[in-house]
């Protein structure tokens, strides 16, 4: 069985270069513009607040399209639409569920997540963690609107990261 951590090649292209603000480095964001006529509605995207979707994180690069955004489309069967600020509890929880996000996977260019990293997670996994009392904080402005098909806005608001 072959594991592919990235979407199919036609969409596996870099459309954003950015850095997630961290205490140990200067923050910057530079986005390479894609002409509007080439962007689908899901690429333009709205967040759960009905505003333009913001970037989630780029160190490490997150998102189904590995562009820093928690946007999704029908090829993303897991619906990686929830922008989380991962913590040790969630990393331990998801590892126990069979998805080890904290261990590096060099073959896929994945450094492993550390507490404080921003990462797009599956809406159903986040909801499962919520139901088990293990859900991490979320950045509402970076959670794609499709998340609301799985998780009520009130629940997300209750786990909003400070400043969100």
Range-by-range predicted roles:
Residues 35-89:
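Extended boundary segments
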Residues 86-100:
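Short, basic/aromatic beta-hairpin or loop at an interaction surface
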Residues 102-109:
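Short alpha-helix capping/helix-loop boundary micro-motifs
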Residues 126-149:
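Short, compositionally biased
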Residues 147-164:
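Glycine- and charge-enriched low-complexity intrinsically disordered segments
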């Amino acid at each position: 069985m072959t594991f592919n951590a990235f979407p199919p090649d036609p969409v596996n292209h870099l459309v954003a270069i950015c850095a997630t603000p961290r205490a140990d480095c200067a923050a910057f964001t530079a986005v390479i513009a894609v002409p509007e006529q080439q962007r689908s509605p899901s690429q333009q995207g709205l967040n759960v607040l009905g505003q333009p979707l913001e970037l989630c994180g780029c160190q490490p690069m997150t998102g189904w399209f590995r562009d820093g955004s928690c946007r999704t489309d029908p090829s993303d069967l897991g619906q990686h639409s929830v922008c989380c600020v991962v913590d040790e509890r969630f990393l331990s929880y998801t590892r126990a569920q069979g998805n080890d996000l904290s261990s590096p996977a060099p073959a896929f260019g994945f450094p492993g997540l550390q507490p404080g990293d921003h990462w797009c997670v599956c809406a159903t996994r986040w909801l499962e963690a919520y139901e088990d009392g293990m859900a991490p904080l979320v950045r509402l402005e970076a959670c794609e609107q499709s998340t609301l098909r799985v998780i009520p806005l009130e629940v997300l608001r209750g786990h909003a990261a400070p400043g969100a």
